[in-house]
From Swiss-Prot:
Keywords: Ribonucleoprotein, Ribosomal protein, RNA-binding, rRNA-binding. Belongs to the bacterial ribosomal protein bS18 family. This is Small ribosomal subunit protein bS18. One of its GO terms (cellular component) is cytosolic small ribosomal subunit. The gene is rpsR. Part of the 30S ribosomal subunit. Forms a tight heterodimer with protein bS6. It comes from the Bacteria. InterPro entries: Ribosomal_bS18, Ribosomal_bS18_sf. One of its GO terms (molecular function) is small ribosomal subunit rRNA binding. Binds as a heterodimer with protein bS6 to the central domain of the 16S rRNA, where it helps stabilize the platform of the 30S subunit. It comes from Natranaerobius thermophilus (strain ATCC BAA-1301 / DSM 18059 / JW/NM-WN-LF). Transmembrane segments: none annotated.
Length: 74
C-alpha cells in the first residue's frame, strides 16, 4: 500500500498576520462553518490552536447576535 504524504496546512490568520478574529467579518467566518452550520475542526481547516479558539468564540458570538444561524434549515 502506498502511503499518502499529508501536507501541513498553514493557519490563514497567521499567514496574514491577523492578531484577532472579529465576529463582524461574516464572509470570513462562513468559510469555517459547514453547510449544516457546524464549526469545522482544526484538523480540517488548518488553523493554529490560538486562532481556532478565537474563531470559535467569534462564531458563537455572531450566532448570539443573530448574524449567523445556529442551524441551516432544509
Amino acid at each position: 500500500m502506498a502511503r499518502r504524504r499529508r501536507r501541513n496546512k498553514v493557519c490563514s490568520f497567521c499567514a496574514e498576520k491577523t492578531t484577532t478574529v472579529s465576529y463582524k467579518d461574516l464572509d470570513r467566518l462562513k468559510k469555517y462553518i459547514t453547510e449544516r452550520g457546524k464549526i469545522l475542526p482544526r484538523r480540517i481547516n488548518g488553523n493554529c490552536a490560538k486562532h481556532q479558539r478565537q474563531l470559535t468564540t467569534a462564531i458563537k458570538k455572531a450566532r448570539q447576535l443573530a448574524l449567523l444561524p445556529y442551524t441551516v434549515e432544509n
